[in-house]
Amino acid sequence: MKEHYFDDLKVGDRFKSEPLNVTEKQLIEFAHKFDPQMFHLSRKRAERTIFKGLIASGWHTAAITMRLFVQTLNFAEGAIGLGVDELRWPDVVRPGDVITVETEIVDLRPSRSRPGYGIIRLCNVTTNQRGEIVQTMLASAMVPMRAKARDNKTTDN
């Protein structure tokens, strides 16, 4: 898989992830650990809620989005999260949903405090197999520039 650097990007670039199937088991395991509300834990109890069935925690959706974003852009040295300005869950994720993430680069600038790094502003839109938007996120991250990678290489003498 190709590694990306700040230098490879331009405003308007879009990247689409591979799909990921969300299983009931994954949904319940995440909920037990991190968001133990009844509509995430029990199919039967969830049927009596406003959701009319089991749903993923929004935080699980955010974690899936992060995984797919990282796998898709595969930044050399990783992407250092600087913050999320907006996070929305306009629809729910249910067991059996197949999730994909489309990332758009909305702004780029060199880091003023960290030479060799750039700051990217991105918009992630997470959808299910029906094209319904289940999450939107506007965030910023710091990623390495190619020159930084060259400066860090060592030679064996």
Predicted features along the sequence, with ranges:
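Hot-dog-fold acyl-thioester-processing enzymes
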Residues: 1-83, 146-157
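HotDog/MaoC-like acyl-thioester-processing domains
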Residues: 1-11, 89, 93-157
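Conserved interaction-surface patches within small, structured recognition/assembly domains
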Residues: 85-87
